Amino acid sequence: SNEKYLRPTLYCNPRAPEVIALANELGAFEKSDREFAEAAFEFVKEKLTLEILPMDGVEATLRRGTGTCFHLISVFIALCRAAGIKARYKMFAMNMIQAWYNTMIDVDPLVKKWYDSMGYFMIEGEGEAYIDGKWMVAHVGPTAERQAAAGIPITKFGEDSLGIWYFALPGTVMHMESIPYGLGQATKLLKKIAPGSMERVNISILKQIEMGKKIIEEAGGKEAYDEMARRKGPKMPKVKLEEKKEIVFEE
């Protein structure tokens, strides 16, 4: 289809053979839109692993089994579009909970410097699928293990990351059919000037996954862990905006 939210966009081709094959396997046009979107969400969230690398197409992400949040969101969106379900990107400038910051940012001096100086320009995103007349959110970036390592609930289809581990800066939430062209530039630049920094973040992510596995096992499985985490509620960071517009996290 060439209709808005169904057609191919940058890095997100719902007509790619890999996408069509997977969409069929997940029950495209057999399940209800809601059931299919949930199946696509579960697949992308739990079967693909976060890895910081330059942006490329959904076909490459599926072959590799890894990608950044935006790679994974693009796979979710492509699967929905392949199944005839309208899907779009939701983007926002954000700051993150301390546990996420420790794993993703604090492990490398260059990444930390970059994040702290860019502050407002850290863009994060989620997918949204149009189900039964309303847009439903899908945050596919973190596996259950990474969420457990951060001490937060295991989010389900329709649950927002905002307010749980990301906090959107007011007035920055945007909805888009496509990833903007400039979005992939930061990771391309980082790979060029400091491949070691990327590697350090990726090693830290893998350690976080291992830690989360243990936490889930000790809790007695994903459901038991999730119940416990929901009872506790999210631990909000104290965010202090300083003169330079840097975001400073305080314990």
Question: Where do the PLM segments sit?
Answer:
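Active-site acidic/histidine clusters and adjacent loop/turn architecture
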Residues: G65, H71-F76
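Alpha-helix initiation/capping motif
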Residues: A16, G57, T68-H71, M104, ...
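Generic secondary-structure transition motif, activating predominantly at the C-termini of alpha-helices
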Residues: L10, P14, G27-K31, V44-L48, ...
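Generic structural signal of hydrophobic/aromatic residues within well-ordered alpha-helices
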Residues: N2, L6, V19-A23, V111, ...
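Alpha-helical and coiled-coil interaction segments, frequently adjacent to or embedded
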Residues: L162-E251
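Secondary-structure boundary elements
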Residues: S1-R64
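Hydrophobic/aromatic-rich core segments of domains that either
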Residues: E42, S74-Y166, V173, P180
